[in-house]
């Protein structure tokens, strides 16, 4: 996989949960000339308390530090339906109780401090099917958290499906963004999945998401906005899809060709 990414012209990637040992991962990434830049961490701060989350979070940070990463991606999974196969992702998202907002914010601040011990920035991922999905929820969380400890991962695909808009969240959170995912959306597949009341997994397997250049989002506007406001971090192109229908290497080339021709050519 690392060789495929390098062959397609990419400079880095995020670590997946199914990667081999940290030693083997680093060896293979280095051999391919790729940087490992981040990994996802599922937190249950509201359900279990921040102190219960810390041991696993430290283990993830240690892993990422070894790999030379600079970001740890976090998403609060209390009540999440993103991984539940028989629940519609479009109308069953969990909602925080009023008193839980501060619990989550304070817990994230604590984890952000820990991340800094390992040379990492904590970036929060707004995500479909979770307590922090919409623009308003994301901006409220950012307002409650310490900007020196908690930053944002901005994801175009989740913003589009969650709010029907990409630029609203980007404009509102630009000063907190330290990591970016560029993911495209096929509107017809999105509406088909909504009508069929599909889960998150079944929606993306049905083709709701795709790589930049293969869907409806015009990435020139968010890209130009990021550059204008001084963003110089990583932008990862991604799209959860059925690999038997959308071969990863083929779609990696589609994404890279689009980025080179449409964004880097500006």
Predicted regions and their residues:
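Acidic (Asp/Glu)-rich catalytic clusters
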Residues: 3-7, 20-39, 55-69, 109-117, ...
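Conserved, mostly hydrophobic/aromatic
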Residues: 5, 13, 29, 64, ...
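A cross-domain feature marking catalytic cores of carbohydrate-active enzymes
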Residues: 15-17, 36-44, 74-76, 124-128, ...
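A short, acidic, amphipathic alpha-helical segment used as a generic capping/interface helix at domain edges
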Residues: 214-228
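A short, acidic, flexible beta-alpha connecting loop/helix-capping segment that sits on the rim
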Residues: 236-247
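C-terminal helical cap(s) of enzyme catalytic domains, especially alpha/beta-barrels
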Residues: 246-266
């Amino acid at each position: 996989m690392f060789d495929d990414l390098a062959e397609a012209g990419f400079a880095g990637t995020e670590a997946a949960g199914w990667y081999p040992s940290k030693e083997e991962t680093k060896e293979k990434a280095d051999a391919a000339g790729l940087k490992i830049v981040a990994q996802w961490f599922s937190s249950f701060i509201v359900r279990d308390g921040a102190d219960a989350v810390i041991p696993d979070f430290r283990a993830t940070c240690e892993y990422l530090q070894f790999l030379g990463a600079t970001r740890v991606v976090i998403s609060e999974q209390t009540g999440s339906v993103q991984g539940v196969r028989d629940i519609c992702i479009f109308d069953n998202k969990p909602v925080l109780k009023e008193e839980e907002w501060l619990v989550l914010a304070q817990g994230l601040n604590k984890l952000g401090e820990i991340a800094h011990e390992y040379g990492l920035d904590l970036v929060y991922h707004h995500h479909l099917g979770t307590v922090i999905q919409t623009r308003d929820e994301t901006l409220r969380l950012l307002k409650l958290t310490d900007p020196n400890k908690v930053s944002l991962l901005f994801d175009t695909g989740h913003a589009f499906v969650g709010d029907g808009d990409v630029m609203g969240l980007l404009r509102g959170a630009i000063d907190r963004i330290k990591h970016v995912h560029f993911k495209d959306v096929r509107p017809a597949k999105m509406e088909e999945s909504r009508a069929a009341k599909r889960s998150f997994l079944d929606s993306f397997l049905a083709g709701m998401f795709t790589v930049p250049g293969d869907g409806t989002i015009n990435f020139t506007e968010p890209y130009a906005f990021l550059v204008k406001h001084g963003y110089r971090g990583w932008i990862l192109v991604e799209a959860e899809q059925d690999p038997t229908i959308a071969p990863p290497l083929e779609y990696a080339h589609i994404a890279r060709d689009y980025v080179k021709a449409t964004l880097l050519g500006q």
